[in-house]
Swiss-Prot record:
[4Fe-4S] cluster 1 binds at residues 88, 124, 157. This is CDK5RAP1-like protein. [4Fe-4S] cluster 2 binds at residues 232, 236, 239. Residues 79-194 form the MTTase N-terminal domain. NCBIfam families: MiaB/RimO family radical SAM methylthiotransferase. InterPro entries: Elp3/MiaA/NifB-like_rSAM, Methylthiotransferase, Methylthiotransferase_CS, Methylthiotransferase_N, Methylthiotransferase_N_sf, MiaB_methiolase, rSAM, rSAM_horseshoe. SUPFAM superfamilies: Radical SAM enzymes. Belongs to the methylthiotransferase family. MiaB subfamily. Potential regulator of CDK5 activity. Binds 2 [4Fe-4S] clusters. One cluster is coordinated with 3 cysteines and an exchangeable S-adenosyl-L-methionine. GO terms for cellular component: cytosol; mitochondrion. It holds the Pfam family UPF0004.
């Protein structure tokens, strides 16, 4: 656009110059070409240049700050850090990595935001409401702080998406660190302590934190998260994740198996494997490709499409799942969040063959309407999705399916909404994560589509989706009454300490009287389901059990 404007201007000026310089010309003098009313003016470029200069002044480069820091400046020396986490399980896992890095440098954890020397917030940008919570929390932290020199840092997706907005509010934020910059936090703290902004939001093509041993939030818990890959290549039009977390890259398979073995030796009983697109995992670092499929087509469900060139070679998610299941047969394994296209039959058959691979699959549909799915660029139709569900249930008859749905996406008609409701009734999910659509900057929807569904309509459709999924979940749970299930104890009931709660293999929460056997969290129990609502099972404890 700039080049086109410059050529128009130069062409006009040169014509006028010839006319006034006495140069002979047979052509008539052309009038200066007018700039379209919807085009860019010179003032637009001046404004943009001024904005970039202001941002450059606010945001120093890494090179500007490295040269005057000594190694001892990076040490915590007992300074306290309060960690605050918002958002998904991936953010919980990321904060465990941050804890490990900061602890290594001599920083000490504190649970008091108002007194801590440093407060680090792990943030989410998936919806506008998630960001508003962080902005409100930042104001509260500053207003309640009794530490005048307190340093506040914003980490994760929001740091990547609204970096400039954060640092322009210097009274609220001192550090901005993107998802691939956590190793740099000690330096960023040192920069902020010196009175400057500390920022690193550079996305990486290879950072996986594979060598960092996380410090987990709840040391008493027997469940853990393991991040196996980062980033996403799917580019769904509504989603900001590819822009805040970058391209897909996977940890070496050996590092994941080793972490599973450590957790096994520490007594953990459930591990959830995490990734933005977890079942597209592909380890390209290992020299052992003997178990890898020869073509990428074997890794995808037939008919499902991608917006990127499919990868081939390496060790796939199916191989990884087989290795971790064999490495820790007493640990239950779950995984999230997957994409429906990455559920080949080899994966489903493996899950069926291993008792410690939970028969609970998250299958994000987002919509049950073909036109809406096309605008979302999900790469499948309603019919393809339903065929996948049928194929899964053929191999795993008792599988528990969960899903994600967006209410009121761009251009969604009332008929499209009804199509989504009918999909929920047809599939019958155990649980659905349902949210009204929130347009995010940088996404393809932001550039190409119109957020044209009124907020009150989004709210009503959101309620419809929630109501229908709960009706179907109630039917599923009531069908379990009278059956025996294996449950992994997670803790005591908040209402009655004599009762314990845990989750069955399908992921549904169960509550039961544990006063006689007094089983501890991390132990397996056999229970008899006696009652149910849409989200919880009531049960009678039969006795201790195993997988």
């Amino acid at each position: 656009m700039l080049r086109q404007w410059w050529l128009r201007s130069v062409g006009s000026c040169s014509t006028v110059y010839r006319a006034h310089s006495g140069c002979s010309t047979s052509a008539a003098v052309k009038p200066k070409r007018a700039i379209p009313t919807d085009g860019l003016q010179l003032s637009d470029f001046i404004k943009e240049s001024t904005k970039k200069q202001r941002q450059k002044a606010i945001i120093p480069s890494i090179e500007d700050t490295k040269e005057y820091l000594n190694p001892e400046d990076l040490q915590g020396n007992g300074r306290t850090v309060c960690y605050v986490t918002y958002g998904c399980q991936m953010n919980v896992s990321d904060m465990e990595i941050v804890r490990s890095i900061m602890t290594k440098y001599g920083f000490v954890e504190s649970d008091k935001k108002e007194n801590a020397d440093i407060v680090l917030l792990m943030t989410c940008s998936i919806r506008d409401g998630a960001e508003k919570k962080v902005w409100n929390q930042l104001k509260l932290i500053r207003s309640n702080s009794v530490n005048k020199g307190q340093i506040v840092g914003v980490l994760g997706c929001m740091a990547e998406r609204v970096r400039h907005d954060l640092l322009e509010k210097r009274n609220l934020v001192n550090i901005v660190a993107g998802p691939d910059s956590y190793r740099d936090l000690p330096r960023l703290v040192a920069v902020a302590a010196g009175g400057s902004n500390g920022i690193n939001v550079q996305l990486s093509l290879d950072e996986t934190y594979a060598d960092v041993q996380p410090i987990r939030v709840d040391s008493a818990s027997k469940t853990a998260f393991i991040s196996i890959m980062r980033g996403c290549d799917n580019m769904c039009t509504y989603c900001v994740v590819p822009f805040t977390r970058g391209r897909e890259r996977s940890r070496p398979i050996e590092s994941i198996v080793e972490e599973v073995q450590r957790l096994r030796d520490q007594g953990y009983k459930q591990v959830t494997l995490l990734g933005q697109n977890v079942n597209s995992y592909r380890d390209m670092t290992s020299m052992d490709f003997s178990m890898a499929p020869s073509t990428s087509q074997e890794d995808r469900v037939p008919g499902f499409k991608t917006v990127y060139k499919p990868k081939s070679g390496g060790l796939t998610f199916t191989t990884l799942l087989e290795k971790v299941a064999d490495a820790a047969p007493d640990i239950r394994f779950r995984f999230t969040s997957p994409h429906p296209k990455d559920f080949p039959m080899q994966l489903i058959e493996l899950i069926a063959s291993r008792p410690n691979l939970c028969k609970q699959l998250h299958l994000p549909a987002q919509s049950g309407d073909d036109e809406t799915l096309e605008r979302m660029e999900r790469g499948y139709t309603r019919d393809l999705y339903l065929r996948l569900v049928d194929d899964i249930r053929h191999v795993l008859p008792s599988v528990s399916l969960t899903s994600d749905f967006i209410a009121g996406f761009c251009g969604e008609t009332e008929q499209a909404h009804q199509n989504t409701l009918s999909l929920i009734r047809a599939v019958r999910y155990s649980f659905c994560f349902v949210f009204p659509y929130s347009m995010r900057g940088k996404t393809r929807a932001h550039h190409r589509l119109t957020d044209d569904v009124p907020e009150d309509v989004k709210a009503r459709r959101h309620l419809d989706l929630t109501t229908v999924f709960r009706e179907e979940a109630l039917k599923l749970n009531q069908a379990l009454i009278g059956s025996e299930q294996t449950v992994l104890l997670e803790g005591k009931s908040k209402r009655d300490a004599s009762f314990s709660h845990g989750r069955i293999d399908g992921g549904v929460k169960a509550v039961f009287d544990n006063s006689k056997l007094c089983l501890e969290p991390g132990q397996y129990a056999k229970i008899l389901i006696t009652d149910a609502n849409s989200q919880t099972l009531k049960a009678q404890l039969i006795g201790q059990s195993s997988i």
